[in-house]
């Protein structure tokens, strides 16, 4: 099977964008400048890029992008840089995303002024105001609109809804197969058309002889009670093969030229 894909329309619309470039050794400063230039039409205000290391030593890149106008794209490859493709998500909580990016960076680059989430009303402290959590419907809607493959879809669900993922994985796998169906491999005929032999009779005969027409000596001994030894069975089979081959050749050599077919003999009925 080919890798899963889908004809679904990718969609991203948000002023706060969280990008993750797996296995990307790109310099954060260079990546920031490239991403900044991609979103000029939406008036970029802030970008943060940080390079981190996986446990296996490979490098990956995180980026938080904030724009004055919501970024609207339908091309999942829009944020590709130098051949590296990112996972694109809406940053629902820019404060948490920024803290996550800055947890253990190897290198960091920032440009612009960070725009934190809105301040609490009526003089309440930030700790007194609980940030509204998105509903499961909102989370799944965002995942469906951003996922570009079956693997990415399941990975995003595992990250955002770990309990549901662990208890309802079979349902998520079913929806993943529907959203990203496997591409059926095109059938390749092992016997390509040729001229003048179009049916490849040799291959058919090679299969017919041992599977259909051939009787083993052991099977013959079971059917013939008077055959007591394997040698007798082989001798009988060789004789029958020789006789039947000659009969077939004789029939082929005596081809009929008459259109009249032999009628079955009418049998006499019972006496009245």
From Swiss-Prot:
Region annotated Oligomerization, chain positions: 175-187
Cofactor note: Divalent metal cations, possibly Mg(2+) or Mn(2+).
Major localization listed first in the record, in broad terms: host cell
Gene Ontology, cellular component aspect: host cell cytoplasm; host cell nucleus
EC main group: hydrolase
Cell compartments where the protein resides: Host nucleus; Host cytoplasm
Binding site for a divalent metal cation: 52, 60, 62, 104
GO BP field: DNA replication; symbiont-mediated perturbation of host cell cycle G1/S transition checkpoint
UniProt entry keywords in alphabetical sequence: Activator, Covalent protein-DNA linkage, DNA replication, DNA-binding, Endonuclease, G1/S host cell cycle checkpoint dysregulation by virus, Host cytoplasm, Host nucleus, Host-virus interaction, Hydrolase, Metal-binding, Modulation of host cell cycle by virus, Nuclease, Nucleotide-binding, Nucleotidyltransferase, Repressor, Transferase
Family assignment from sequence similarity: Belongs to the geminiviridae Rep protein family.
Notes on the domains: There are 3 rolling circle replication (RCR) motifs. RCR-2 may be involved in metal coordination. RCR-3 is required for phosphodiester bond cleavage for initiation of RCR.
Function in brief: Implicated in enhancement of V-sense gene expression. Acts a an inhibitor of C-sense gene transcription.
Name of the featured protein: Replication-associated protein A
Organism: Maize streak virus genotype A (isolate Nigeria) (MSV)
Lineage: Viruses, Monodnaviria, Shotokuvirae, Cressdnaviricota, Repensiviricetes
């Amino acid at each position: 099977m080919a890798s899963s894909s889908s004809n679904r329309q990718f969609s991203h619309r948000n002023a706060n964008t969280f990008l993750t470039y797996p296995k990307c050794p790109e310099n954060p400063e260079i990546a920031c400048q490239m991403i900044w230039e991609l979103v000029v039409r939406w008036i970029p205000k802030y970008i943060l890029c940080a390079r981190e290391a996986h446990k296996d030593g490979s490098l990956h890149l995180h980026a938080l992008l904030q724009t004055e106008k919501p970024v609207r794209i339908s091309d999942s490859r829009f944020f590709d840089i130098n051949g590296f493709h990112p996972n694109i998500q809406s940053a629902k909580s820019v404060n948490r995303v920024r803290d996550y990016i800055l947890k253990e960076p190897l290198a960091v680059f920032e440009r612009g002024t960070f725009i934190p989430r809105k301040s609490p009303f009526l003089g309440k402290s930030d700790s007194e105001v609980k940030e509204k959590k998105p509903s499961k419907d909102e989370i799944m809607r965002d995942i469906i609109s951003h996922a570009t493959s079956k693997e990415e879809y399941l990975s995003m669900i595992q990250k955002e809804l770990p309990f549901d993922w662990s208890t309802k994985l079979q349902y998520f796998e079913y929806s993943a197969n529907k959203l990203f169906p496997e591409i059926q491999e095109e059938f390749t005929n092992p016997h390509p058309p040729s001229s003048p032999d179009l049916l490849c009779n040799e291959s058919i005969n090679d299969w017919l002889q041992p599977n259909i027409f051939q009787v083993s000596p052991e099977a013959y001994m079971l059917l013939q009670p008077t055959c007591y030894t394997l040698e007798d069975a082989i001798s009988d089979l060789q004789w029958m093969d020789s006789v039947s081959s000659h009969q077939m050749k004789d029939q082929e050599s005596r081809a009929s030229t008459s259109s009249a077919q032999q009628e079955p003999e009418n049998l006499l009925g019972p006496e009245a």
